[in-house]
Amino acid sequence: MKGIWGKIAGIVLGMLCFCIPLWSCAMFEASDKKVSDMDFTVVNPEVLSEEIRKMIEERKKDAFQMAYHDGSYSYIIVGYGQQETSGYSIAVNDVYQGEDGIWVDTDLIGPEKSEKTEAAASSPFVVIKIESVDQTIRFKN
């Protein structure tokens, strides 16, 4: 009888050890609730340092998100990976202060059906400049 209760207690304890971390993740999910708007500028990648341009070049084949801080400004870079043709662009829908960090909302926009595209692959990305922040940057895309 003692052996059965020991096995049952072990199973229950194992289930709790597995489920509690899952519950805690669900309880602390990031909130994208807007607190205030933020000023931002979409910048030409050519104004970035050679170091950052090299980091983008290394990552742009796959989708990526990164931030770079130079003291005065934070640069948020979102790339959508390699696309089969040219003609893609990226819309920056919103950049705002949320309850738990800075939120960035972007969308990849494909070429219009009537638009002439080249068969050459492209790797669209956007660089967003905001005043320097010491907060987590989160992405909605």
Annotate the PLM regions.
Residues 3-11, 21-141:
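Exposed, flexible binding/inhibitory loops of compact, secreted disulfide-stabilized domains
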